[in-house]
Curated annotation (Swiss-Prot):
Cofactor: pyridoxal 5'-phosphate
Name this polypeptide is given: Phosphoserine aminotransferase
Membrane spanning stretches: none
Organism: Listeria monocytogenes serovar 1/2a (strain ATCC BAA-679 / EGD-e)
UniProt xrefs under Pfam families: Aminotran_5
Length: 363
C-alpha cells in the first residue's frame, strides 16, 4: 500500500525502516517464537530490550551518570502532576506559560495540595506567538518549569535559561529533534508519540538528587519507587519501549541528534521560506521563536483554510488541520518526516494558491 504524507502532531510518523523491522519481527522476536507483545517483562529477552533502550538514549542525549532514565506510562500529562508532587516539597514552583500545554501543566500543579505556583513569564498577551524573556528565579523556588516546544502554537525555546534552581522541561514535541545539554536540566519529560515511538510510553530523565524528596507518595507516582525498580514497578509498556529502542537505533544511524537537527532545520527552512515569500499563506509565529517540528500557517480566509485541508487530504497530505483551539493549518515535521514530503507540500500549496488568487473558493 502506498503511504501518504502524515503531518500528524501525534501519534506521528515513524521511520519506515523501523516499521519494516517491527513487521519482520512481529510474530517471532529474536527467534523466540513469541512476539515482543507476548514477552514477559521479567524475561531476559525484554530486559535486554530495556537495557539497550536506556543505553541508546543515554548515548544520543549524552545523559550524565547522575541522572536516572525512566520509561513510564500516563503520558506527559501525568508528569504535570508527578513533577510538583515529587519536586515542590513545600516550596514555590515557577512556571513559564508559552501555550496550551504549559497552561495545562500550570493548572495541574495548582491542584496539588501545598504547592504554590507562580507564573513568572507568559506570551499569552500576543497569542503565544513568541517566547517571553524569563526573569531570574529566586533560589528559594523548588524548580522552574518550561516547555521547550509548543506543539499547538508552533514556538520553540532553544536557549534554556541558566538557573539557580532545577529546570524542568516538557520536551514532548522536540525531544531528540534538537541538541540540548541535559546538564542544564533537573528533569526532562516527554510523551513518546511524536519523536520516540508509539503512544503509551513516557520518557523521564531526572537528576538523582531530586529523587526521594517527598515521602508518602502513591507508589506509582513516586520517582523514587520507579527509579528503584528500574521502570518495572509494574508491567511497563513493553512494545512501545521496543519500538523506541528501534527508533533510537535509527536516529544513531542518521548521525545522532546533531544529524537529525541539521535535517530538521533544512526541512523547516524550506517551508518557512515558502510561507514568508507567499502572498497567500502566512505564519502567525514570530521568526525568532519558530519551531522546527510544528509549523502552523493560515490563509486570509477560514473558508480557504477549510478548502485547503480538504483538498490536501484528497492529494495524500494527511492531518494538516490546525488544532481546534487555533484553527488554520499545521504541518508537523518530526524526525521521521521525509524532506520529500515538505517539497511535495510546498508544490501543492503553490498550486492551491494560484488556483484561488481570484478569490473563489473551490471545494
Amino acid at each position: 500500500m502506498e503511504r501518504v504524507y502524515n503531518f500528524s502532531a501525534g501519534p506521528a510518523v515513524l521511520p519506515v525502516p523501523v516499521l519494516e523491522k517491527v513487521q519482520r519481527e512481529l510474530l517471532s522476536y529474536n527467534g523466540s517464537g513469541m512476539s515482543v507483545m507476548e514477552l514477559s517483562h521479567r524475561s531476559e529477552l525484554f530486559q535486554n530490550i530495556l537495557d539497550d533502550a536506556e543505553s541508546l538514549i543515554r548515548e544520543l542525549m549524552e545523559i550524565p551518570d547522575n541522572y536516572k532514565v525512566l520509561f513510564l506510562q500516563g503520558g506527559a500529562s501525568l508528569q504535570f502532576d508527578m513533577v510538583p508532587m515529587n519536586l515542590a516539597n513545600g516550596k514555590k514552583a515557577a512556571y513559564v506559560n508559552t501555550g496550551s500545554w504549559a497552561k495545562k501543566a500550570i493548572s495541574e500543579a495548582k491542584k496539588i495540595q501545598g504547592v504554590e505556583v507562580e507564573v513568572i513569564a507568559s506570551s499569552e498577551d500576543r497569542n503565544f506567538s513568541y517566547i517571553p524573556e524569563i526573569p531570574t528565579v529566586s533560589s528559594d523556588v523548588a524548580y522552574l518549569h518550561v516547555t521547550t516546544n509548543n506543539t499547538i502554537e508552533g514556538t520553540a525555546m532553544f536557549d534554556v535559561p541558566d538557573s539557580a534552581v532545577p529546570v524542568v522541561a516538557d520536551m514532548s514535541s522536540n525531544i531528540l529533534s534538537s541538541v540540548y545539554d541535559v546538564k542544564k536540566f533537573g528533569l526532562i519529560y516527554a510523551g513518546a508519540q511524536k519523536n520516540i515511538g508509539p503512544a503509551g510510553l513516557t520518557l523521564v530523565i531526572v537528576r538523582e538528587d531530586l529523587i526521594g524528596q517527598v515521602e508518602g507518595l502513591p507508589s506509582m507516582l513516586d520517582f523514587k519507587v520507579q527509579a528503584e525498580n528500574d521502570s518495572m514497578y509494574n508491567t511497563p509498556p513493553t512494545f512501545a519501549i521496543y519500538v523506541a529502542k528501534l527508533v533510537f537505533e535509527w536516529i544513531k544511524e542518521q548521525g545522532g541528534v546533531a544529524g537529525i537537527e541539521a535535517l530538521n532545520r533544512k526541512k523547516a527552512a524550506l517551508l518557512y521560506d515558502y510561507i514568508d515569500q507567499s502572498d497567500f499563506f502566512s505564519s502567525p509565529v514570530e521568526p525568532s521563536a519558530r519551531s522546527l517540528t510544528n509549523v502552523p500557517f493560515v490563509t486570509n480566509s477560514a473558508e480557504f483554510d477549510k478548502a485547503f485541508v480538504k483538498e490536501a487530504e484528497a492529494n495524500g497530505f494527511e492531518n494538516l488541520k490546525g488544532h481546534r483551539s487555533v484553527g488554520g493549518m499545521r504541518a508537523s515535521l518530526y524526525n521521521a518526516f521525509p524532506i520529500e514530503g515538505v517539497e511535495a507540500l510546498i508544490a501543492f500549496m503553490e498550486k492551491f494558491a494560484n488556483a484561488r488568487k481570484g478569490g473563489e473558493v473551490r471545494v
